[in-house]
């Protein structure tokens, strides 16, 4: 009986504890990211932002959560009730599942699988289903139009994102995210320089992937009221909101892992190794999240045809050319990894 416990049940308990250890801090980070966004944008616009609830407004996310929790959930009369309720749950759960393969520090990862990149791409592609289901189930033209926009936008930028990731795989020779980070420890500086433009393209693509300004066409307030979540209230609206911000943190972690060295110190400076890798990971993710907020505060929304043109006529040819360029340079210099 004891052998059975240690062989089958104990590993499941450890996995459950790891999931809780990642999920609870992540939800807290998502809650306080909304607070940080309002404060940062407020300061950029010479306003105070939320500063009443608690010291410096730090209890504002808790007040917002309590308010949304006690709101009445309203389901439209002609909506598909089951799908209407399921859609925000799908979006939120998928935004959390992606964290399973992200390495926070050396050896600190929930599932260190050898196909981590494919797993991340699969999860990010599935997240659009929650939005499409919400738009269709709401039985509203605004919600449906927002859902169609979101699916078209995601398809357009998933292609260039995939090609950018191929350039990373060519230089590191692995699909394991922990090994990708470790490969950057010994990577020559000129390869880092060659990947830098792709890092910029990847970051712009994930802005479109997460429906953030200047690519927030699926929920354009001035055109579609609120897009795919126009009919949602209470916790349904809150789950969409949490899912969007959790995705922001996830794609920032992906960008950090692929292009900024993950948990490694900046520029591989050896004397900075004394600082824990988790600190560097959080610092880099925090910087990218600040860029998200900065872009939202300063840039206007793209027109929809401009958004599509950027994805198909600029990013797709550029990333295709860069894949050929990187592979040619690696073969010529004999730096192609032995897989």
UniProtKB/Swiss-Prot annotation:
GO terms for cellular component: plasma membrane. Signal peptide: none annotated. Keywords: Cell inner membrane, Cell membrane, Membrane, NAD, Quinone, Translocase, Transmembrane, Transmembrane helix, Ubiquinone. It is a multi-pass membrane protein. It is an enzyme of class 7 (translocase). It catalyses: a quinone + NADH + 5 H(+)(in) = a quinol + NAD(+) + 4 H(+)(out). This is NADH-quinone oxidoreductase subunit H. It comes from Rickettsia bellii (strain OSU 85-389).
């Amino acid at each position: 009986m004891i052998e059975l416990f240690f062989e089958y049940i104990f590993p499941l308990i450890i996995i459950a504890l790891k999931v809780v250890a990642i999920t609870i801090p992540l939800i807290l980070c998502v809650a306080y990211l909304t607070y940080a966004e309002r404060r940062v944008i407020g300061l950029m616009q010479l306003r105070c932002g939320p500063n009443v609830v608690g010291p410096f407004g730090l209890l504002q996310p808790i007040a917002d959560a309590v308010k949304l929790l006690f709101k009445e959930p309203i389901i439209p009369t002609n909506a598909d009730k089951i799908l209407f309720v399921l859609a925000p749950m799908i979006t939120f759960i998928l935004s959390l599942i992606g964290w399973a393969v992200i390495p926070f520090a050396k050896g600190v990862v929930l599932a260190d699988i050898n196909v981590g990149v494919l797993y991340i791409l699969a999860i990010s592609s599935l997240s659009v289903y929650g939005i499409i289901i919400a738009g269709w189930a709401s039985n509203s033209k605004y919600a449906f139009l927002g859902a169609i926009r979101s699916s078209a936008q995601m398809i357009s930028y998933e292609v260039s994102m995939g090609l950018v990731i191929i350039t990373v795989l060519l230089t590191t020779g692995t699909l394991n995210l922990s090994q990708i980070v470790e490969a950057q420890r010994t990577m020559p500086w000129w390869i880092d320089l060659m990947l830098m433009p792709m890092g910029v393209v990847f970051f712009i693509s994930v802005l479109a992937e997460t429906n953030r300004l200047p690519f927030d066409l699926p929920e354009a307030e001035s055109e579609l009221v609120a897009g795919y979540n126009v009919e949602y209230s209470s916790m349904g609206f809150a789950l969409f909101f949490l899912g969007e911000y959790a995705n922001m943190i996830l794609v920032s972690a992906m960008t950090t892992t692929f292009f900024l060295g993950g948990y490694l110190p900046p520029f591989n400076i050896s004397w900075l190794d004394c600082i824990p890798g988790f600190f560097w990971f959080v610092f880099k993710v925090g910087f990218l999240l600040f860029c998200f907020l900065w872009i939202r505060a300063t840039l206007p929304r793209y027109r929809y045809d401009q958004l599509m043109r950027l994805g198909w006529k600029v990013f797709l040819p550029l990333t295709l050319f860069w894949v050929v360029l990187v592979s040619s340079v690696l073969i010529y210099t004999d730096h192609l990894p032995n897989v």
